[in-house]
């Protein structure tokens, strides 16, 4: 089983876990198993925009063999308007920044000019789809940072998002190399700081070195990119198996599916499928289009920046 498939399934499963309770206040519910319906009245196992945009990014990168922003944006267009890359031919839970950027692209605007550039354009809609870049990009850290800026900027073209996405990409890359998760975070922060540490926007991530020590009350699970990255890494560091990590994430409330997806991708990479610590088989059983996802993850090892 490829690490890419395990990581992608980790993201998809946790996304689906969070879909039924998205926007619910913290502690107003308790997810313990895969459920359905709820917020969007979807069947159990149905994944949302987090997975769709991740899979759209992966499909383009595999087919092209490199990071191609225009091709990835075209895949996003096919997802939003033609229901490709969806779980059950239904597009739902699309963030405003992503919807606006893809609509703008459809009006003939160049892909690099579609993403929001303001400080308020820092939702988690770029972060949630960065996993393939973390696992597949080859090149120098500077080249990887440039690629992440391009792909994040398709929908979220502000430095706060760029930094958060790069940290996540570096964490995933460190985990893929076999680093222990705390070491992976420390190394990722060092690598990202060499590129962006001088930027004022870096201050949005100063809690990350000590994130594990924070209490649940100090962790926010909003749709803001820095909150989502903090919450996902906190869940990863506070748990020792996939199930506990994913459930901790989706039970934080608010943006449950995206916090789950961001944490779940890393947890899937660490713990794999099945076994005592891996993604529970009863959760993957209800995920639609598993064979397509598996095929998408086969035969791709690296992509050029």
Model segments located where?
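Structured, active/binding-site neighborhoods that engage oxygen-rich ligands
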Residues: 1-305
């Amino acid at each position: 089983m490829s690490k890419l498939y395990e990581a992608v399934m980790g993201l998809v499963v946790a996304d689906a876990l969070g879909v039924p309770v998205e926007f619910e206040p913290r502690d107003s519910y308790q997810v313990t198993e895969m459920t359905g319906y709820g917020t969007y009245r979807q069947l159990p196992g149905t994944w949302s925009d987090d997975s769709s945009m991740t899979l759209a990014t992966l499909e383009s990168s595999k087919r092209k063999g490199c990071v191609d922003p225009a091709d990835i944006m075209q895949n996003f267009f096919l997802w939003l308007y033609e229901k490709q890359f969806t779980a059950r031919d239904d597009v739902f839970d699309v963030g405003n920044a992503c919807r606006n950027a893809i609509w703008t692209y459809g009006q003939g605007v160049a892909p690099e000019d579609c993403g929001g550039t303001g400080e308020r354009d820092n939702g988690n809609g770029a972060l949630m789809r960065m996993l393939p870049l973390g696992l597949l990009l080859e090149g120098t850290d500077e080249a990887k940072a440039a690629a992440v800026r391009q792909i994040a900027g398709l929908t979220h073209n502000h430095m706060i998002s760029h930094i958060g996405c790069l940290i996540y990409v570096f964490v995933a890359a460190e985990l893929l190399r076999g680093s222990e998760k705390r070491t992976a975070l420390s190394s990722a922060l060092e690598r990202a700081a060499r590129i962006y540490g001088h930027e004022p926007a870096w201050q949005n991530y100063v809690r990350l070195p000590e994130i594990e020590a924070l209490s649940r009350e100090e962790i926010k699970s909003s749709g803001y990119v820095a909150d989502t990255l903090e919450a996902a890494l906190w869940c990863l560091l506070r748990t020792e198996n996939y199930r506990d990590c994913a459930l901790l994430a989706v039970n934080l409330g608010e943006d449950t599916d995206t916090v789950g997806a961001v944490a779940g991708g890393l947890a899937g990479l660490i713990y794999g499928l099945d076994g005592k610590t891996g993604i529970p088989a009863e959760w993957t059983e209800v995920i639609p289009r598993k064979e397509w996802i598996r095929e998408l993850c086969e035969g791709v090892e690296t992509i050029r920046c």
